[in-house]
């Protein structure tokens, strides 16, 4: 049966054998090129950030036109991201994301619109990049989950070391405190290890809380002293850096995690290549690492 992007409110059941081509891995690609690259490399689906979707709509793309491109290629639109500071107000004050609005209602509505139009499975959210976690963070996350549930959307909180949700323990506290069935975690290998986490901290996470795994690699020591600059420019393909990905994936497999793997490699080096080249390299590298960890990905390159 061909893949369809016309399943509003539908949350597909996926596993670690299903690969998603994250927005940032081919961040400079046009929508058509992104979809074509994902299809050629055998990805189950793609990610599209909330601001990117909003720009496409502003440029005149209709949901029907976007859906046609996806359906013709046999690719699902599975994830979205870009909800910053779910319990904060104002804007990011400094760094590469300066000026981005926290708890941006336009981004939230874009996520819900994508869920309604394409059956997007999950949206990733982060804490704020200044200050401390707000006292009402649990309540705010619960509210976001409730609004997302009306659109069949899962909400995956991603800990980022330089944010108000810096590690797995903090993220688990928010998610379990909120207690919403569509709320859970996005676990990124880069953020886990760059934030001082290890396999022991990963083993403490209940498997059913993990909604999506982001896989990437890189050097153990930072290339740039600014965390966000480093994370947005110097990642490497899985298996080509120094992070212990086999141990990372081994814990997830042993603890019974069933979540798709989103390949998110933010890299200036990859930016110099074509989207098709990047998608092929990312798929091959990820499948190799998964196989070595005893996880057999679905879908060979077409």
Regions found by a protein language model. Name each.
Residues 17-23, 46-48, 77-82, 123-125, ...:
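Hydrophobic faces of well-ordered beta-strands that scaffold small-molecule active sites
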Residues 3-11, 32-33, 72, 88-184, ...:
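Active-site acidic/histidine proton-transfer and metal-coordination neighborhood
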Residues 38, 46, 70, 115, ...:
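Conserved, mostly hydrophobic/aromatic
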Residues 46, 143-242, 293-299:
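Acidic/histidine-rich catalytic cores of soluble enzymes
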Residues 22-26, 49-53, 82-85, 128-130, ...:
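Active-site beta-loop-alpha junctions enriched in small/polar residues
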Residues 35-40, 58-80, 106-119, 139-150, ...:
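Acidic (Asp/Glu)-rich catalytic clusters
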Residues 55-61, 83-106, 129-135, 226-236, ...:
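Surface-exposed, active-site-proximal loop segments in enzymatic domains
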Residues 7, 12-29:
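Boundary/entry segment of secreted carbohydrate-active catalytic domains
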